[in-house]
Amino acid sequence: MAGRSEEDQQLLQAIQIIKILYQSNPCPTPAGSRNARKNRRRRWRRRQAQVDSLATRILATVVHGSQDNNLVDLPPLEQLNIRDPEADRLPGTGTVDPGTKDN
């Protein structure tokens, strides 16, 4: 066995990418108030779900080949990042349900 096959190389590269994804979302720190810890854990779980979804798609693409019926085209993996979309909002710019009335 002088070297690895191309399929093995692709699988190893996918595993390295998945490892980097998981390492980019460390567990939240236990510091702060109870509410702050709760919010950090909630945001972490949401990001972790995104990482799980991406990892599943990456691994499925490598193992089973690319699917032609993808509804969304993914950008190159080098451009993907994990961020909290709620952190980008300005305070007070949340969505308001017009069906509710203020009492």
Swiss-Prot record:
Q: Present the record's domain note.
A: The RNA-binding motif binds to the RRE, a 240 bp stem-and-loop structure present in incompletely spliced viral pre-mRNAs. This region also contains the NLS which mediates nuclear localization via KPNB1 binding and, when the N-terminal sequence is present, nucleolar targeting. These overlapping functions prevent Rev bound to RRE from undesirable return to the nucleus. When Rev binds the RRE, the NLS becomes masked while the NES remains accessible. The leucine-rich NES mediates binding to human XPO1.
Q: Where is the composition biased (Basic residues)?
A: 35-48
Superkingdom: Viruses
* Protein keywords: AIDS, Host cytoplasm, Host nucleus, Host-virus interaction, Methylation, mRNA transport, Phosphoprotein, RNA-binding, Transport
Subunit info here reads: Homomultimer; when bound to the RRE. Multimeric assembly is essential for activity and may involve XPO1. Binds to human KPNB1, XPO1, TNPO1, RANBP5 and IPO7. Interacts with the viral Integrase. Interacts with human KHDRBS1. Interacts with human NAP1; this interaction decreases Rev multimerization and stimulates its activity. Interacts with human DEAD-box helicases DDX3 and DDX24; these interactions may serve for viral RNA export to the cytoplasm and packaging, respectively.
PTM info: Asymmetrically arginine dimethylated at one site by host PRMT6. Methylation impairs the RNA-binding activity and export of viral RNA from the nucleus to the cytoplasm.
Name positions with the PTM Phosphoserine: S5
Show the GO MF annotations. Answer: DNA-binding transcription factor activity; RNA binding
Q: Residue numbers of motif Nuclear export signal and binding to XPO1?
A: 72-83
Further remark:
HIV-1 lineages are divided in three main groups, M (for Major), O (for Outlier), and N (for New, or Non-M, Non-O). The vast majority of strains found worldwide belong to the group M. Group O seems to be endemic to and largely confined to Cameroon and neighboring countries in West Central Africa, where these viruses represent a small minority of HIV-1 strains. The group N is represented by a limited number of isolates from Cameroonian persons. The group M is further subdivided in 9 clades or subtypes (A to D, F to H, J and K).
User: What Pfam family is a match for this entry?
Assistant: REV
Name of the protein in question = Protein Rev
Q: Which Gene3D superfamilies match?
A: 6.10.140.630
Per the entry, what this protein does is: Escorts unspliced or incompletely spliced viral pre-mRNAs (late transcripts) out of the nucleus of infected cells. These pre-mRNAs carry a recognition sequence called Rev responsive element (RRE) located in the env gene, that is not present in fully spliced viral mRNAs (early transcripts). This function is essential since most viral proteins are translated from unspliced or partially spliced pre-mRNAs which cannot exit the nucleus by the pathway used by fully processed cellular mRNAs. Rev itself is translated from a fully spliced mRNA that readily exits the nucleus.
Ranges for region Disordered:
24-49, 82-103
